[in-house]
Amino acid sequence: MNFKKTSIFTALSFMTVAVVAATSIATTSCQNANASDTRSLPAPTKSAKMTLMESLQQRHSVRDFSDKVVSDADLSELLWAACGINRPDTKKITAPSAINAQDILVYVCTKDGAWLYVPDGNSLHKVSDKDLRPAVAGRQEAVAVAPVSLVLVSDRTKFGDCAKGAEVMGAIDAGYVSQNICLACTALGLATVPRMTMDKETLAKELHLDENKTLLVNHPVGYEK
């Protein structure tokens, strides 16, 4: 009898160890999968040699880009300027928004895929492995050469009870972010142009946008050719 009990307890112990090990492996795999979907950006310095007035003076639209890569450091500065957190204690951002809805989502499209910018943490969350720059370019194929394309989307659910005016408020909020991008690009020595032309059907599908999210503006970003 003792032998049988020992065998049973030994078997149960092995089963417990196996379950714990399997759970640990599964948890680790899940964590690794999530980690692989998140890309941390360098902390922005939040500084530039160019003054605001100089940036306003020199800002101009560019539609002819080289394929020179935009560094992660410059991308981080640009995204922070677009709608990054500038008041950490209240989580408020650089761009104003109606009723502080912070409804504008910024997607970053490159040859390696598409990411959603996450201001809280200054990181990118991958949403697609596809190069969506041609879809952003739409009928104006030349701008697809730009190494980065930023896509501005309004999430109407952020307006809550004020949803009736969400379409107009979202468009205005996108304008604020767009202007931040224009001025930051100038200060960083980058080139851009605000555009509305894009293949919205393809982008909505590939970025997994539901009916409450509206594609509004896009910005090819790179260096003038």
Residue ranges and their predicted role:
Residues 2-15:
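Bacterial N-terminal signal peptides that target proteins for export
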Residues 31-146:
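N-terminal amphipathic, basic helical "cap/leader" segment at the start of enzyme domains
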Residues 45, 152-156, 223:
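Short, small-residue-rich loop/turn micro-motifs
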Residues 59, 78, 106, 148-159, ...:
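Small-aliphatic-rich amphipathic alpha-helix that forms the alpha element of a beta-alpha
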Residues 209-225:
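A glycine-rich helix N-cap at a beta->alpha junction
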